[in-house]
């Protein structure tokens, strides 16, 4: 079908919106990295991004929604590991991807502390991020059960918590680097914990 003159303004508007959103999210990420979530303001984002405050408020109600948008944007790249025919490798792929995101230290630390103190953010985080990751781990666990690598009664939620929990604990409390060796240790521990008996 041929493009009409009426299609042009819509395309321009869509492109402008995408550029504005990219500038806003980029500025937000930079400001959180520099100042933490506590130092994030809509005024600061507007100044850094060059986008009007009214445009920002049209999309995000407040600083908390903007901070959550960063977390959603950061985790968007995570998706169900492909079927590799090897449950351990699929879980390792998931943990390595999660590690890459969590290693954005200052940003993640700031966002996690905000989530811990604000129930509405915690709820949104669970609904828009955790539940998605849980579904991805469930796909891997289901394949592992079908292969006989994991028992049929494997608790997906517990497996997910065991895969991701050590990453946050190390980042926030104990301090050693998150690296491939640690990812392997986490996955091996989970595989042993759920090994068919």
Predicted regions and their residues:
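Short amphipathic alpha-helical segment with a characteristic S/N-K-E followed by hydrophobic residues
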Residues: 24, 39, 62-67, 77-78, ...
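Amphipathic alpha-helical segments used for helix-helix packing
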Residues: 70-71, 102-124
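Hydrophobic alpha-helical segments that form the core
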Residues: 152-172, 183-190
